[in-house]
């Protein structure tokens, strides 16, 4: 039997099973011992899951891991302020982006709702590889035109041919240039695609995927280092599969963002420990393209030294099984943290985690106190424990997610940055 590889774990709480004992966790400990690389944090709003997710990200920042958080609502962005509260300070980079520098290293908030983010995630600009550009374009189009009636196989082939031609002749290709070409195509069915994309380019979040004509700028974030938190405040969050145009655009943007973050992390040397955190993960997993992306990180992450942390309100939202509910990559799970939820969802978690049914785990989960950080933790061996996650009160004060508090923090950071 191989020796256990020891890692620099962090105290995250205490076990409530019998005698209280300390509980340690590290996002890379499982894969360091040939286990899975995926940790999940699930529970209803106010249950403590976001608090626990932030605590793990802070611990990884202290350990100088490269951490990239995707957080549509912006809850995780408070880590940048915590870095200041811990003794750091606000700074601005050459582009005027505000970040904090302190005990957690550099913590940067990439606000995709800001006016400066127009064209920041143009799928034709994120990689110089033709295969990547076409993969991104196909995935984005399939999410936006998901009914299959508008984007038929023949129409897709024509669109891709126009895209290939643009990539051949344009030194700075963009989705904007492609959209103009499609809008004037002789085929009416192709023009419909172009006109729809043109309308999307005028929306608050759609414009993030369309680089302005004449722009030669690279993405604002061109490499992963320190802690980066991408936010999309105000984005439409579908409860399940996106049902309207606004939700489809939001999910398409999130897919492009997640693809790009994976691209940046996989480019880093394997010796660098990397943590990818996706909050509201159901927005990614509810589409086939996003699910495939998550599966790829779960499969390939161990060889690239990437730990994947998924947070969502329901465990069933982020199951790693295939479309039929079986197979998939369930063995990629390293740890599961289940906070308070309703009894039906709790029963689903008990089954998915392989816990014995009929022993009251579902009732216990449903009765956990809200906001206290109480959860059931299942480790890579399938061993469960009810724990109270410990977060210092000073951190909790900063982690508050009240919208007015968040706006006040952003204003204060802007005034203090040098």
Where are these regions (language model features)?
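Basic- and hydrophobic-enriched, low-structure N-terminal and domain-boundary segments
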Residues: 1-42, 394, 417
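P-loop NTPase motor domains
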Residues: 2-22, 72-74, 81-86, 114-306, ...
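Structural signal for conserved beta-strand scaffold positions within catalytic alpha/beta enzyme cores
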Residues: 24, 108-111, 229-231, 338
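Conserved P-loop NTPase motor cores
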Residues: 29-47, 51-59, 68-77, 113, ...
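Walker A/P-loop NTP-binding active-site region of P-loop NTPases
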Residues: 47-121
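Short, conserved catalytic or adaptor-binding loops enriched in Gly and charged residues
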Residues: 95-104, 219-222, 327-331
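P-loop NTPase motor core of the ASCE superfamily
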Residues: 124-173, 177, 322-418
């Amino acid at each position: 039997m191989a020796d256990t590889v020891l890692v620099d774990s962090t105290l995250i709480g205490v076990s409530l099973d019998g005698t209280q004992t300390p509980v340690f966790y590290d996002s890379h400990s499982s894969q360091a011992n040939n286990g899975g690389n995926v940790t999940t944090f699930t529970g209803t709003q106010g249950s403590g899951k976001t608090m626990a997710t932030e605590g793990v990200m802070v611990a990884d920042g202290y350990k100088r891991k490269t951490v990239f958080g995707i957080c549509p609502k912006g809850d995780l962005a408070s880590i940048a302020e915590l870095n200041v509260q811990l003794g750091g300070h606000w700074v601005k980079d050459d582009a005027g982006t505000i970040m904090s520098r302190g005990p957690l290293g550099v913590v940067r908030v990439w606000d995709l709702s800001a006016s400066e983010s127009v064209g920041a995630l143009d799928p034709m600009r994120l990689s110089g590889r033709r295969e990547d550009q076409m993969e991104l374009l196909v995935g984005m189009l399939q999410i936006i035109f998901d009914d299959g009636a508008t984007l038929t196989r023949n129409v897709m082939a024509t669109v891709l041919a126009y895209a290939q031609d643009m990539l051949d002749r344009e030194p700075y290709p963009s989705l904007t240039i492609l959209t103009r070409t499609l809008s004037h195509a002789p085929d009416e069915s192709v023009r419909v695609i172009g006109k729809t994309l043109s309308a999307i380019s005028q929306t608050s979040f759609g414009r993030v995927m369309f680089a302005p004509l004449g722009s030669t700028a690279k993405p604002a974030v061109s490499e992963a280092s320190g802690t980066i938190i991408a936010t999309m405040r105000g984005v439409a969050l579908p409860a399940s599969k996106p049902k309207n145009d606004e939700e489809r655009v939001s999910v398409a943007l999130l897919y492009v963002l997640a693809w790009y973050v994976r691209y940046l992390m996989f480019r880093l040397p394997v010796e660098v420990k990397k943590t990818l955190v996706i909050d509201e993960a159901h927005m990614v997993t509810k589409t086939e393209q996003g699910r495939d992306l998550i599966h790829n990180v779960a499969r390939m992450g161990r060889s690239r030294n990437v730990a994947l942390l998924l947070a969502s309100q329901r465990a069933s939202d982020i199951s790693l099984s295939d479309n039929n509910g079986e197979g998939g990559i369930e063995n990629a799970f390293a740890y599961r943290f289940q906070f308070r939820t309703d009894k039906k969802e709790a029963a689903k978690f008990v089954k998915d985690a392989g816990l014995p049914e009929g022993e009251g785990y579902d009732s216990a989960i449903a009765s956990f106190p809200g906001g206290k950080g109480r959860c059931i933790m299942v480790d890579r061996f399938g061993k469960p424990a009810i724990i109270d996650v410990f977060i210092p009160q000073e951190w909790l004060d900063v982690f508050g997610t009240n919208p007015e508090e968040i706006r006040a923090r952003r204003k204060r950071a802007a005034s203090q940055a040098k």
